[in-house]
């Protein structure tokens, strides 16, 4: 098959440029997916932004020989090179948090863009390794196996030579799986009910008895008119997960339509909270190319040091993004928890999660229904009796 396939791990951008991406593309994309996808979804904002940046930068290099030479010899165009270094810093942070991420971009090998994509990818990977003092950027057998099992089969289904040779068609595929390394210690496991959203088309519209992990720890919480939230830090990289529970009369869609305001709310001071999180895993396998139709991708890069007015159209954009909510260690199963007078935050209904740090969003998900996503367990009481 005549094409150029680039495998890369997601990297970083500077504060100003990142905020532009987050607002102009990522949040618009999330709203579009939320609008047309009633089921659960998991979206690696990090991977998608990196794919768009690589294509944009490659198009800029294609039209500027001096910029291309600068990237090759590492001299001149300091702002562009610094932008690449900033992507590397963000990748290092995600890598430290043990994100499993991989992307591929494919265009016809006959096109000049193929060589430019390869160059941009090589510079990005070199920049990532400059920040990688622990050497965990280097390819590993585990990552190769993960790429093979999760991405190559999907790519083969829709990347065909006849398509790639038909003009400048671009195909992208993005894979991500994250199992959060919670900083908080979970003490026990208990079976509780999760109230599914009846409008999502899943088989079960009744509450599902699911295993939940329980932690009594000190957390930061937040509150808006639409949601109440709790921030659960990860054990590395200064990342964490913000869980947003919609208030009565508010939906997850309402939260996602106003996500920028939700995630920028100041947190309350730390306090002891009984946290109950469902134990489950979810995968979002979808072609998201159509969701970019109403988004001006080029406007996103107006502040980039890589200058290009070329249109970006990705003909196929397949994502395979997943999340696993699970304890780090095996927990003792208990029948009940004495919460006393301490505040309880129980994630027992549809919710939104955001993996983030103080500046950047790394992943966003909406969980409407847990039917079939957890181990089958029995609750001690019928839901109607509670």
From Swiss-Prot:
GO biological process annotation, one example: sexual reproduction
InterPro entries: Serpin_CS (IPR023795), Serpin_dom (IPR023796), Serpin_fam (IPR000215), Serpin_sf (IPR036186), Serpin_sf_1 (IPR042178), Serpin_sf_2 (IPR042185)
Gene3D superfamilies attached to this UniProt entry: Alpha-1-antitrypsin, domain 1 (2.30.39.10), Antithrombin, subunit I, domain 2 (3.30.497.10)
Record keywords, A-Z: Behavior, Glycoprotein, Protease inhibitor, Secreted, Serine protease inhibitor, Signal
Tissue distribution: Main cells of accessory gland and seminal fluid.
PROSITE patterns: SERPIN (PS00284)
Glycan-modified residues: 24, 378
Annotated signal peptide: 1-22
Database matches in Pfam families: Serpin
Effect of residue 22 to H: In strain: ZIM5C, ZIM10C, ZIM16C, ZIM18C, ZIM28C, ZIM30C, ZIM34C and ZIM53C
Cellular location(s): Secreted
Primary location recorded for the protein, binned into one broad class: secreted
PANTHER family from the UniProt entry: ACCESSORY GLAND PROTEIN ACP76A-RELATED (PTHR11461:SF372), SERINE PROTEASE INHIBITOR, SERPIN (PTHR11461)
Main function: Responsible for physiological and behavioral changes in mated female flies. May play a role in accessory protein regulation and/or in the coagulation of seminal fluid to form a mating plug.
Protein name, as recorded: Accessory gland protein Acp76A
Protein's organism: Drosophila melanogaster
């Amino acid at each position: 098959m005549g094409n150029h396939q680039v495998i890369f791990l997601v990297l970083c951008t500077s504060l100003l440029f990142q905020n532009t991406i987050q607002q102009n593309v990522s949040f618009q994309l999330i709203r579009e997916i939320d609008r047309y996808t009633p089921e659960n979804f998991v979206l690696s904002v990090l991977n998608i932004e990196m794919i768009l940046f690589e294509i944009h930068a490659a198009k800029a290099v294609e039209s500027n020989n001096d910029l291309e030479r600068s990237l090759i010899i590492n001299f001149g165009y300091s702002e562009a090179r610094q932008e690449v270094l900033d992507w590397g810093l963000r990748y290092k942070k995600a890598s430290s948090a043990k994100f499993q991420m991989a992307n591929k971009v494919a265009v016809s090998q006959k096109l000049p863009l193929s060589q430019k994509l390869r160059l941009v990818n090589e510079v990005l990977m070199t920049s990532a390794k400059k920040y990688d003092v622990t050497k965990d950027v280097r390819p590993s057998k585990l990552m190769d196996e993960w790429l093979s099992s999760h991405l190559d089969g999907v790519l083969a289904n829709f990347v065909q030579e006849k398509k790639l040779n038909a003009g400048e068609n671009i195909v992208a595929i993005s894979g991500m799986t994250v199992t959060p390394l919670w900083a908080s210690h979970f003490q026990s496991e208990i079976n509780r009910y999760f109230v599914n959203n009846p409008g999502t088309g899943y088989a079960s519209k009744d509450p599902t008895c699911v295993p939940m992990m329980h932690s009594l720890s000190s957390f930061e919480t937040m509150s808006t008119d639409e949601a109440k939230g709790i921030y659960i830090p990860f054990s590395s990289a200064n990342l964490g997960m913000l869980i947003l529970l919609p208030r009565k009369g508010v939906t997850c869609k309402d939260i996602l339509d106003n996500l920028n305001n939700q995630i920028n709310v100041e947190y309350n001071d730390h306090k002891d909270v009984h946290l109950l999180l469902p134990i489950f895993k979810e995968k979002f396998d979808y072609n998201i190319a159509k969701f970019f139709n109403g988004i001006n991708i080029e406007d996103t890069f107006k502040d980039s040091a890589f200058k290009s007015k070329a249109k970006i159209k990705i003909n196929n954009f397949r994502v395979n993004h997943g999340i696993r909510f699970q304890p780090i260690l095996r927990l003792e199963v208990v029948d009940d928890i004495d919460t006393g007078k301490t505040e309880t935050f129980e994630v027992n209904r549809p919710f939104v999660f955001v993996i983030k740090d103080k500046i950047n969003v790394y992943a966003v998900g909406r969980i409407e229904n847990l039917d079939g996503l957890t181990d089958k367990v029995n609750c001690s009481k019928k839901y109607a009796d509670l």
